[in-house]
Amino acid sequence: MSEISDAEKRRILREKRQQKFNKGGASSRLAKITGQTENSFLSTESPLDSRESTYPAQETKAPAGNEDSTKQMDELLAKATSKTTSKASSPPGSAEQQNGNPELDLFAQIAKLQQNANNETVSTDPSGTPDIFAQLMASMQQDEAKGGSPGATAQQPIDPAIVEAHNIAVNKLKSYTILVKWLFFLLPYLYYITHSARDPFQHNAVNYVLDRSNFFTVFTTFEIVALSVYYQLLMSAEKSHNVNTLDNNSKILKLVSMVPPGLVPIPNLRGKVAQALQYWDVVSMYLTDLCFAIVLAGLFQYYHSM
């Protein structure tokens, strides 16, 4: 005979143990195990003696009422589906009267609050739920159109080669402006007014310009005209290259652009700083020319006195 497998051995032992329990005597065995006497106050009756006799396990069959429970579940699912369909076909206003789904009621209340706050029409999807993401996208597009968002004021990145070519053109323009200004007007003018022995001209206007007491008036007027011409040429160069010289070269303006909006209680901080830097550029060019003019006037005066 072939050896009995372990599973078969366990099954046989389990059946023998079950038969022993079915014969009774479980209460006496429990009393022996716990060491209790017959007159003990504690109950020594085993539940194995009180249950009905068991039989070997048989194949399980589906209960007779399973079909009834299945029918009931089908009816419940059909009712739930009909309720969902009726809610989807009902208008958005009727969602407030139906308390079956609290999530839909919550979305409806949020939509009503948004309507009262913004006085705008709330777009809803076919199920009656407000499309909040569509509203957010629409508000962002409106902000970008009005220029209120931070991204609306940000400039598009410019090719560094174009910026470098623009800077070279601006430096050439500034050099040519300084060269023409000093070579054709300031140097001859300073040389002549510092000369002590000079003959007066017949025109009073020329004599007024060459008068030493009118030096600052004539110098300031000439600087205003020269700087105006320079800035007109600079603006035309910026327009042709589509590059803002101050935005791409000023480190101060770049640092100001890094300040988050609302941190400093000054509206349009970047624009005001840019305007101040433009004014400072004009004043610095005027003061530089004035300092060089005073130094050259002293040198020419010393040369004429020799």
Curated annotation (Swiss-Prot):
It is found in: Endoplasmic reticulum membrane; Golgi apparatus membrane. Signal peptide: none annotated. It is a multi-pass membrane protein. Residues 78-90 have a biased composition (Low complexity). Residues 1-18, 68-77 have a biased composition (Basic and acidic residues). InterPro entries: GET2 (IPR014802), Get2/sif1 (IPR028143). Residues 34-57, 91-100 have a biased composition (Polar residues). Residues 194-214, 303-306 are lumenal. The chain crosses the membrane at residues 173-193, 215-234, 282-302. Residues 1-172, 235-281 are cytoplasmic. The keyword Transmembrane applies. Residues 1-100 are annotated as: Disordered. PANTHER family: GOLGI TO ER TRAFFIC PROTEIN 2. Component of the Golgi to ER traffic (GET) complex, which is composed of GET1, GET2 and GET3. Within the complex, GET1 and GET2 form a heterotetramer which is stabilized by phosphatidylinositol binding and which binds to the GET3 homodimer. Required for the post-translational delivery of tail-anchored (TA) proteins to the endoplasmic reticulum. Together with GET1, acts as a membrane receptor for soluble GET3, which recognizes and selectively binds the transmembrane domain of TA proteins in the cytosol. The GET complex cooperates with the HDEL receptor ERD2 to mediate the ATP-dependent retrieval of resident ER proteins that contain a C-terminal H-D-E-L retention signal from the Golgi to the ER. Belongs to the GET2 family. This is Golgi to ER traffic protein 2. It comes from Lachancea thermotolerans (strain ATCC 56472 / CBS 6340 / NRRL Y-8284).
